[in-house]
Amino acid sequence: MKNIPEVKLGIVAVSRDCFPMSLSESRRIKVCQEYKKAYGDIYECPTVVENENDMLKALDEVNTADCNALVVYLGNFGPESSETLLAKKFGGPVMFVAAAEEPCGDALIDNRGDAYCGMLNASYNLALRNIKAYIPEYPVGTPDECAKMISEFVPVARAILGLKDLKIISFGPRPQDFLACNAPIRQLYNMGIEIEENSELDLFESFNAHAGDERISAVVADMEAELGKGNKMAGILPRLAQYELTLLDWAEAHKGSRKYLSLIHISEPTRRTPI
């Protein structure tokens, strides 16, 4: 069972129509070069977003590429409505980051982007729309700095994706779907987490049903290899292997609509599990 999300990053450059689009595009290319060199793969969306029509096209491109996390990159000031709508419609974890100014030389008109100011407007517009996006503590940087910030977004995105598709399966004194007597779980629901409480007696019954399971010997061998010289209680390994298989089969049978699972046991001082 694969129990951790795989993050597939996409990056979309945005550009305000009174600034050169080529500036935002060339800066995005540099950021992606730095990211791929130091951290891994990232999908470069070919469409630069200037307006809502561009936003819809870019959204289709990142979805077609199966991206589940998105970087909105302000190569210049950026169109605050279109870029924040992109974050709203994407549906997954989104990060905003912006380009620092570079030496302009003789091309001040073409090489100045004011992305710092654009990031201020973007953050305000995100708040107005009640959009939760990841913004680094200092979200403006050179290509290598932006690449580093994007790499720090990956574990954040992984956590968000995991929570959105997580089910917590617990074992305690009450049967399944008897949540009226449970501890407060609203905040878990608010994060998109699903809860399924099961009776520990049902777990014990399932454990007994796994007695003599032909897979136990292979699990025991794996445990012995992992423990090595630390294997001081070899006699208990078959029962632990039986319990491990019980939990794995339970998880597979009960994951339902969710991709990721967490198994917990609700402890009560007055009860003992005979496993």
What is each residue range found by the language model?
Residues I264-I275:
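Single conserved hydrophobic/aromatic residue that forms the stacking wall/gate
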